[in-house]
Amino acid sequence: YDTAYGLCQIIGQNNRFGPAQIASLTAEVKTIVERREICPHIFPSILKALKSSTSANVRMLGNRLEPLLQHDVFERRQNGSSSLPISPHIHIFDVSSYPDTIRTTLAELLLYDWFRSARALQIPIVIMVDEVQNLRLGRGTVLNRIITEGRKFSIGSILISQSLKGFAPDEQLALSQTGTKLFFKPPLTEIRACSEMLAEPVRRSGTVELLKKLKVGQCLLLSDFTYIGDSLQPSSDCIQ
């Protein structure tokens, strides 16, 4: 039930479903999750169940979710995960080719599956997310849980963003909890937001000047584990 509910919460939030709709969707998804040994293609199985339901409301959910569920992304694997091949290799999942209307939902579902699988299997992994500004990081989201809880389960994360302007205050709070922050030269419109994340108020004006003076390829690094140069001047030393 927890797996079905977690998946349906993400789908429901991204599609603005109400509690009753999420409950109906969860009931259908729970059946598929319980039968995933014989229904390995999870999304098509969910879509078929929704569209063949005796309930008109459930069939309506199937029609609304067909653009998402017609993509056979999740597949039952021998190691217990649905989409993540747990192995000592790098695996790249590119969702840019999917329609804009389902891209965020699909990315969050993948993150949820990886987080759940890695936590259950107790295998350390690192999840790198590019263009993270396109995803939700607020309280209760899967990416927020990866940031705030991941280290307890040996799950690391590397988050890459072109901008901080799109993040809400609670999302910036989540980002501030990351162990290491690395800022390359930002545009002038981003300098204040970067300085607020890098420095306490009493040191913020100095940080603004440092950010303005950065050259291409230089960056400011804030970390509990690495110290390069001094606190007043940027360093051109390579990060090993």
Where are these regions (language model features)?
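P-loop NTPase motor domains
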Residues: 1-155, 159, 168-171, 202-203, ...
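P-loop NTPase motor core of the ASCE superfamily
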Residues: 20, 170-240
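Short hydrophobic alpha-helical runs that function as membrane-insertion/retention elements
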Residues: 156-161, 181-185
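Conserved beta-strand edge residues that scaffold enzyme active sites
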Residues: 164-165
